[in-house]
């Protein structure tokens, strides 16, 4: 399809993002790429992150740089651009990076195609996620960017500046960037250093590559915001009654924050003792497993669910410490 197929042709209210304001933003009406638009999910947009990301999306800077979101596991780094795309109806592809990934993996590959009548064989180019996003104007999210080998990330330098992309796999086609192409990267590290020493598999990236990003820190949410996220997974019943007691959810969020404070990877932990932390993702899983444990008539639904969703991943010493915190918190 032509590069100009995808274009801003409607507006979306900022209320779609949870903010009370008359402001509206350019967005997309129905298009041929609906299959690539992320599903809209419950998400708490934090103003301090939402505003700079939104500004960047519509700015000329987005044609000269990528946007790197860094923060602890499960803090909403990847969900932020995905859920913004969902509300703007902007097609978006997320790629999970790894140390063996190459630029060719992102560009695409050539396969043999056999004519069913004549038996003649021809080659056909199958575009990869980068090629699709570059050509059509999608958002590309390179998740866990700091897992990439430095030779691969260096090979991507040109795309952050919207330079022409040469498709060697497609007979040397020179592909110009769609003006709406945007690229995000996410990582537990900011690409240059793992201060905790706990992020196994991450690679120190080349400074010249990381210099091509605007970088934002994505910490865990405030207690009240995280509580709202939990509550959104357990809406009231038709009679308006709670399906999950709020006082229990509050204690769960408080416990998650206690664990984070004692996490070795937390720069403010003052010598913490835990080698694993409880993310918002783990917190949601814990709450859902509490419901499951109640339904199967578990002896202690809260502690058993905590084991299933979090503590069983830890060493016996750390698991015992987690269970002790739970007993003190929940009785």
Label each region the model flagged.
Residues 1-331:
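C-terminal regulatory/interaction module of P-loop NTP-utilizing enzymes
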């Amino acid at each position: 399809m032509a590069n100009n197929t995808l274009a801003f042709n409607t507006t979306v209210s900022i209320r779609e993002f949870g903010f009370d304001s008359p402001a509206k933003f350019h967005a997309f009406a129905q298009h041929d790429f609906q299959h690539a638009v992320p599903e809209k999910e419950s998400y708490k947009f934090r103003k301090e992150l939402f505003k700079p990301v939104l500004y960047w999306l519509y700015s000329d800077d987005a044609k000269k740089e990528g946007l790197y979101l860094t923060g602890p596991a499960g803090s909403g780094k990847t969900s932020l651009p995905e859920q913004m795309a969902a509300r703007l109806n902007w097609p978006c592809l997320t790629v999970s990076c790894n140390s063996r990934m190459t630029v060719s993996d992102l560009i695409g590959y050539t396969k043999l195609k056999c004519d069913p009548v004549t038996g003649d064989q021809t080659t056909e180019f199958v575009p990869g996620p980068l090629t699709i996003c570059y050509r059509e104007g999608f958002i590309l999210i390179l998740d866990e960017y700091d897992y990439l080998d430095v030779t691969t990330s260096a090979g991507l330098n040109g795309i952050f500046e919207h330079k022409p992309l040469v498709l060697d796999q497609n007979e040397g086609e020179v592909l110009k960037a769609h003006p709406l192409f945007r690229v995000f990267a996410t990582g537990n590290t900011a690409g240059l250093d793992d201060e905790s020493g706990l992020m196994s598999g991450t690679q120190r990236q080349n400074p010249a590559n990381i210099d091509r990003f605007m970088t934002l820190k994505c910490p865990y949410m405030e207690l009240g915001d995280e509580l709202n996220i939990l509550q959104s997974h357990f809406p009231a019943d038709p009679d308006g009654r709670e399906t999950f007691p709020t006082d229990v959810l509050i204690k769960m969020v408080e416990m998650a924050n206690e664990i984070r404070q004692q996490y070795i990877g937390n720069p403010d932990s003052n010598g913490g003792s835990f080698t694993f932390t409880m993310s918002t993702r783990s917190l949601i899983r814990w709450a859902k497993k509490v419901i499951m444990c109640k339904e199967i008539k578990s002896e202690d639904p809260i502690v058993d669910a905590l084991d299933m969703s979090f503590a069983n991943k830890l060493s016996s010493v750390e698991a015992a410490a987690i269970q002790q915190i739970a007993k003190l918190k929940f009785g």
